[in-house]
């Protein structure tokens, strides 16, 4: 069962849990679930570096998770806790894009060989729990 975006836009804990509960309900026993979410940490860095937002605004968005009443940001740890509360088994909780947002112009200018190296790095980095929160997007994959 894929939940690819609902957690981006539901601001209350109750609404996010309701969406996740519905995914669990329709998932067969032993089935696989995937929940996509936005990371607070990576989005903080992106806002500071690429969007040149004021630090006051960045701190308010970070603390609340609310970005312009459009997006909700969370952490890998918070998503893990929600999934544990639903008795789900975590298989992976990965960072999807990591720090690629810091160098989009550099990525666009890469040769095919350089880009292949970057993709190899991204695959390895996605599984590294120490840097998962630095990614803009997270993906929790688990089993019912």
PLM features per residue range, with description:
Residues 68-87, 93:
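Short alpha-helix
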Residues 11-14, 46:
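Conserved catalytic-core motifs of eukaryotic protein kinase domains, centered on the activation segment
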Residues 2:
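A conserved beta-strand element that flanks and buttresses the S-adenosyl-L-methionine
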Residues 17-32:
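A short glycine-rich, Lys/Arg-flanked "PGG" loop and its adjoining helix->strand segment in the class I
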Residues 11, 28, 144:
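Short conserved AdoMet
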Residues 32-60:
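Conserved class I S-adenosyl-L-methionine
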Residues 91-144:
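A C-terminal cap/extension of S-adenosyl-L-methionine-dependent methyltransferases
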Residues 5-9:
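Short catalytic micro-motifs in class I SAM-dependent methyltransferases
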């Amino acid at each position: 069962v894929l939940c690819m975006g609902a957690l981006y836009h539901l601001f209350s804990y109750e609404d996010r849990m309701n969406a996740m509960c519905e995914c669990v309900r329709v998932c067969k026993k032993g089935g696989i679930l995937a929940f996509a979410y936005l990371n607070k940490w990576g989005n903080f860095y992106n806002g500071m570096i690429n969007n040149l937002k004021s630090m006051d605004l960045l701190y308010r968005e970070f603390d609340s998770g609310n970005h312009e009443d459009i997006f909700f940001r969370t952490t890998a740890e918070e998503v893990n806790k929600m999934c544990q509360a639903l008795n789900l088994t975590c298989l992976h909780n990965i960072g999807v894009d990591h720090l690629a947002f810091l160098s989009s112009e550099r990525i666009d200018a890469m040769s095919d060989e350089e880009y292949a190296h970057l993709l190899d790095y991204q695959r390895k980095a996605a599984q590294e729990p120490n840097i998962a929160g630095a990614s803009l997007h997270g993906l929790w994959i688990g089993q019912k």
